[in-house]
Amino acid sequence: MTIADNKKAFFDYFVEERYEAGIALEGWEVKAIRAGRVQIKEGYVVIRDAELFLIGAHISPLQSASTHVKPDPTRTRKLLLHAEEIKKLIGKVEQRGYTLVPLNLHYARGRVKCEIGLAKGKKLYDKRETEKDRDWQREKARLMREKA
């Protein structure tokens, strides 16, 4: 079940490969995510010391969050992947033009997972082409409905 999608990622990047990663979360973050108070549109993934981190994802704390814990909505969160997957991603990201972007948050067997994509940035003309294709698909569907 999907919690949050990053629709902007598909507009700004060509996503070539997808990986499912676990996220190291605190208790208040899990509760807030279950309440749907998460946004990953501004998030991105960085590699530091052979580890992946999700930066810029915003999880709004609930009013009932603990008083002895100071919730930080945009803290850096560690992503959990197998070592060989991380090595593969490091090799790809070091190539020119590749980056890692969060695509969505979802539940897998009761755990919150983050799907990350190995992506290449789109140029402005690529974005325009994508928009034209989407508009044409919408127009085509409308015409087919009118015929039927």
Curated annotation (Swiss-Prot):
GO cellular component terms listed in the entry, alphabetical order: cytosol
Primary location group: cytoplasm
One record GO biological process: trans-translation
A Pfam family recorded for this sequence: SmpB
Disulfide bonds: none
Region of interest called Disordered, as start-end residue ranges on this chain: 129-148
Keyword field: Cytoplasm, RNA-binding
GO molecular function ontology, one term from the record: RNA binding
Coiled-coil segments on the chain, per record: none
InterPro entries: SmpB, SsrA-bd_prot, SsrA-bd_prot_CS
Keyword match RNA-binding: yes
Entry-linked NCBIfam families: PRK05422.1 (NF003843), smpB (TIGR00086)
Entry function: Required for rescue of stalled ribosomes mediated by trans-translation. Binds to transfer-messenger RNA (tmRNA), required for stable association of tmRNA with ribosomes. tmRNA and SmpB together mimic tRNA shape, replacing the anticodon stem-loop with SmpB. tmRNA is encoded by the ssrA gene; the 2 termini fold to resemble tRNA(Ala) and it encodes a 'tag peptide', a short internal open reading frame. During trans-translation Ala-aminoacylated tmRNA acts like a tRNA, entering the A-site of stalled ribosomes, displacing the stalled mRNA.
Assigned protein family: Belongs to the SmpB family.
Name this polypeptide is given: SsrA-binding protein
Organism of derivation: Ralstonia nicotianae (strain ATCC BAA-1114 / GMI1000) (Ralstonia solanacearum)
Gene name for this UniProt entry: smpB
